[in-house]
Amino acid sequence: MCIRDSLLGPDLQLFRLLDSAVLEPVSAIVVLGGSAPLRALEAARLYKDGWAPEIILNQALRRETFYAFSSLGIDLVEQHEYNREALLRSGVPEKAIMVIEEEVENTYAELRAVLQALPEETTLIIVTSNYHTRRAAAIWNHLTGGQVKGLIRWSRSDTSFDPTTWWKNRRSKRFLVNEYMGLIIYWLGFPLGIAFL
């Protein structure tokens, strides 16, 4: 057995990077930013399977490049717009899609904005990528004190990270390191660390 397998195991279960809840009907489905449109496609499947009557999207923080293009008269399509279009083309009606107006730049800000925008009794399915599930769950539990149900689900369309062969792919190694660094910062409770989650 190699050191990699003894520390992490081929399926990453020792350090529990991956997390996924058993589904049950909820108030809404939240699509976390990133990996457009793959997370939105999973949300559309969940919606059509009857798990929730509404899908929530966040708007990413507009950075300097957005405004530079805009000043040149170049219109950029933002990620939430791609996701919205993917939902519509997947058969989700427009009235079932909610876009939160607040611009956000990380998972913590996304989930905080969702929590602030919805009624207290809301329950959610939170869709992300498989490598991001543990951190998303930790942040949600931190924000809600574990009092608001948020079921974590990864997108089956997003195959960018394979937990059984992650060490063979540079991108997967980067995902793994980034997620563990985020979790370590979170677990250590660094005051500034929360901004990076």
Go through each PLM region and give its residues.
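Transmembrane alpha-helical segments
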Residues: 7-9
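A transmembrane-helix-recognition feature enriched in membrane-embedded lipid enzymes
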Residues: 169-196
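Conserved small/polar residues in nucleotide/adenosyl-binding loops
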Residues: 1-5
